[in-house]
Amino acid sequence: GVIADLAAARQPVIDERGRPETPPAPEGGLAVQLAGIVWTLINRQLLSRDTGGLDVTIVNDIPDGAGLGDEAARGVAFALALLGDGDDLDDAPVRARIAEVCHQAAEMFSPVPPLRARYTAALRGQYDSVSVIDYADGSVTQAPHPQSGDLEFYAITVEQARVDRSAEILRRRRFVEEACRAFGTESLRLLPDASQRVIEWLTAVHKVHGEENTPEIGDAAAWLAFEERETERGLRMARALRARRIDDIWHLIAQSQSGLTGPYGLLGSEAMVQLCIVRGALGARAASAGNVEAVIAGVETRRAPNFTQDLADDGLAVIRLGRGRVAGLADAGR
């Protein structure tokens, strides 16, 4: 069928030099994305092949372009609805598998590069906690949520906030994926001296195959350095949250934002971040770098009314963030 053909077009092929060719970017609207979830669930043997046609209605109160993961929330909700008859939907291994399926479907059928952590947090998170996800081993632990009576968080966005830097995001991700394949590892974090060895590998690739469809050495080194430092910042952030040292998180957020728009080169949110700081935020960072210009900002509760009013006067949309809840099925009988 159509979905199977689209999935086949996304599979990597090997060129005459023995290197994987980059498949075309996914194309298709919401119907294709939802059908892709059905197709992936069937092929992963989570859904019967006898599944018939579907009439889908989606109710969504997440503002478009806010960078709050509405695509992931929609995909997870749809998958849970399809699997609603299962008795084990609350089991961690099952939820981990559903998150993997939803992320895989988004990679194949969504034009927006998905963030795997959003699917994991939606299905395996906990109320009142921040999910700490280790990509090296897939483990998920929880840290105390920083929101309190003295601290609020907001998403700040603007009309037409979506930006299309999908090609740049995919270019960085595919470089890391090719490096992982070259070294036979699922994560560069499992590779000793990863940055140095990957650069040596890339240099050899350039000498043998040329530089076509590969990053320049300087760009690759900057990306790897950012990934390494961002991982360290994530670990330090988790320790600060668990120790309830909230004052320690703001410089980590600032460093992360600086790295995104500097060495990593995903521009688009820096002006909004600076405006939030000027208006009184303790810290702010891109909500979904390269996809939207929205940011997430933390503000002292006593300053929140002036902060939100000033940004509203600037023509921005300001959305107060709660702590959320884990994805689940509502009782249709209520």
What are these regions (language model features)?
Residues 68, 286-287:
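Short glycine/threonine-rich catalytic loop with a Thr-x-Gly-x-Asp
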Residues 1-28, 132-286, 296-334:
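C-terminal nucleotide
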